[in-house]
Amino acid sequence: MATKIRLQRHGRKGYAFYKIVVADSRAPRDGKFIERIGSYNPNTNPATIDLNFERALYWIGVGAQPTDTARNILSREGVLMMKHLLGGVKKGAFDQAAAENKFEAWLKGKKDALNNMKAKVKEAAVADDKVKLEAEKAVNKARAEAVAEKKAAEAKAKAEAEAAAAAEEAAETEETPVEAAAEEAPAAESAE
C-alpha cells in the first residue's frame, strides 16, 4: 500500500490547524488515516509542532512519502536528519553513538536558533508596545492640555463676565442715587 505522511485540516475558516497523519495515498485529504503522528498549528509565531519522533522515523524508514509541507515539518524536527544518519550507520561510515552525538549537536543548534527567534519576536512585541504606549501618552497629554486650556479660557471668560456684571451693578447703584436726587430736585422745585 502506498502511504503518505500528510496534513489533515481542522479548525475554522481562516484559523486552520492540522493533524499530521499517515494515510493511504488514495484516501481523501480529511478522510481515513492509518495513524496520527502529530499536530501542526501555523497560527502561532513561530508555528507550533507536536510530533511523535519515533513513529515518524519508523514511517519514513518503511517508505512513507511526506508531502511538501510535511517534509518541511519533518526536516525542522530532525526526522529526516536522523534517517540520514541511520543510513550512514547501516553503511558503516560511523557507529550509532557517533550518529547520536551528531544528531544532538544538530538539534541543539536548531533549538538555539528557534529560541533566538522567539526572543526576537518577544523583544519586537515589547518594543512595539512601548512605542504604542509612548504615542498614547503623548495623545493623552495633548488632550489634557487642550481640556486645561479650554477650562482656563472658560474660567477667564466667566471671571470677566462676573467682573463686567459687578461693574454694571456698581454703575447702576451709582446712577440710581443720582437719578433719585435729580427726581427729588424737580419735585421740590415744582412744589415751590
Swiss-Prot record:
GO terms for biological process: translation. Keywords: Ribonucleoprotein, Ribosomal protein. Residues 178-192 have a biased composition (Low complexity). SUPFAM superfamilies: Ribosomal protein S16 (SSF54565). One of its GO terms (cellular component) is cytoplasm. Signal peptide: none annotated. One of its GO terms (molecular function) is structural constituent of ribosome. Residues 153-192 are annotated as: Disordered. The keyword Ribosomal protein applies. The keyword NADP does not apply. Pfam families: Ribosomal_S16. InterPro entries: Ribosomal_bS16, Ribosomal_bS16_dom_sf. Belongs to the bacterial ribosomal protein bS16 family. HAMAP family: Ribosomal_bS16. This is Small ribosomal subunit protein bS16. It comes from Porphyromonas gingivalis (strain ATCC BAA-308 / W83). The gene is rpsP.
